[in-house]
Curated annotation (Swiss-Prot):
Protein name as annotated: Sulfite reductase [NADPH] hemoprotein beta-component
Statement: the UniProt record of this protein carries the keyword Calcium: no
Pathway, per record: Sulfur metabolism; hydrogen sulfide biosynthesis; hydrogen sulfide from sulfite (NADPH route): step 1/1
HAMAP family referenced in this protein's UniProt entry, alphabetically: CysI
Swiss-Prot/TrEMBL GO biological process terms: cysteine biosynthetic process; hydrogen sulfide biosynthetic process; sulfate assimilation
Pfam families: NIR_SIR, NIR_SIR_ferr
Chain residues that bind [4Fe-4S] cluster: C427, C433, C472, C476
Amino acid sequence: MSEQKLALNEYLKIDSDYLRGDIQEGLDTQVTGSFSDGDQQLIKFHGFYQQDDRDLRNERKEQKLEPLHSFMLRARVPGGICTPAQWLEVDKISSTLTTSNSIRLTTRQTFQYHGIPKRNLKTLIQGLDRAALDSIAACGDVNRNVMCNPNPVESKLHAQAYAVAKHLSDHLLPHTRAYAEIWLDEEKLLGTETVEPVYGKTYLPRKFKMAVAVPPHNDVDVYTNDLGFIAVSEAGELIGFNLVAGGGMGSTHGEVETFPRLADDFGFIKTDDVTKFAEAVMTVQRDWGNRVVRKRARLKYTIVDHGYDAFKAEVEKRAGVKFEPKRDVIIGDRGDRYGWVEGIDNKFHLTLFIESGRIKDMPGQTLQTGLREIAKIHKGDFRMTSNQNMIIAGVAAQDKAEIEGLARKHGLLGQVLSGTRGHSIACVALPTCPLAMAEAERYFPEFIDHIDALQAKHGISEQSIVVRMTGCPNGCARPFAAEIGLVGKAPGRYNLYLGASFEGTRLNKMHKENIQEAEILAELDTLFGRYATERDAGETFGNFTVRIGVVKAVNDAAKDFHA
């Protein structure tokens, strides 16, 4: 392929001196709250995105002011685990260095800050560093935050799986010192050449997402990742993983060459071979991935374009190990288990529902204060889940009452929570996300109220339904793997997707395009009525919509999703 055909981002990476670019110069320039267009792409590798308040965009334009620029920073927290001391620093930063005065738990088991003025970026990153946290590779064309099932019951197996996730996260970090030089004031070592042994000078063609699942729970939505490891155990001990690859949610409205996809099963690998296979998959993607058309640059398209067999053979060649036949595992619920759960270590774990992951103080719900007070006395750890919730983990029996009392006092516990609400997530969308076409987080609680009311009307409130909403088709809340998926098309308008499996092993398919709330609810009212009277015993809503022909099953995303 000729150099002239490469996507613009490829040239930016080549010329960036291993992700340094002109970020330092942009940081020193305070006459504008933004970075240059090129550096806006490079800062993603450092963990943050440039945004602006879209609610104020037109008003500021009329006043001949530049947009109210700010930044969203996402931390790297493998497996979502941090200490109470770290959480107190995370909390302090949100209150002193952001304009949102909140913390947002993400769908990838980490947290992010919104509303960071450019002048506060360096201070914020240094604050994270003091707490042994960072935002390296939380965004950009690299391996992002590695997810791992925060399973509080099978804690021994979880610990083993978490160790793998943490190792992969650390091992696959970029080697460039750009982050340390720019944000932590480390001196650049003259005469030394940066070498990226896995990534190379141009890193990956696109983002790369990885997850470790511990069956039967699939809260990490393992099949939606570029690379997934499904733990296989014998007698409670980890012996290896089923490897899956080629998942991803992002697509573009109206462009049939883009589509969401679930990962393919490739086979079983031993625990000792995980690093070899992870590197092999990533380097095949590095070398085979599309660097001309970014919309077709994810691993899912690489596998589709080159073929499953060719991709598998190349991965085995680079790993130096053959896949064994995949082992039988049960893939089950994707939700979190709310309330207290006892672990095998005689410790207790309290899962708290955080609506859309937004931690802030509101009338009647002082969530941020509550978690701060818990962190001051808690002796275990905090575990963020991929459903945007928080687990207060490792609580001794004698400490339960005090922890629970604080949680109830601050509205973190005691909510009336339907099964559907507990299984549902939404992305941030407006007003900060520049890609959002419609509301998500701000509207989602009200929308779920309507869903709860319809389920009650038809006597199906006991049935949990996975509902997800995003403001655009990039799919940050994994809407295409939801039994009911709403994807923003325009203000107040969404595409309605139906038919995914409850367990996350089948995608959904568009049922209605560009419709408003009234039509969405009318469609669901009718379908809930039929589901109440026509469902088979134990049949989930997603499976029901496929069985009765409301939508066709998506078995091969490249062929079926847009058909």
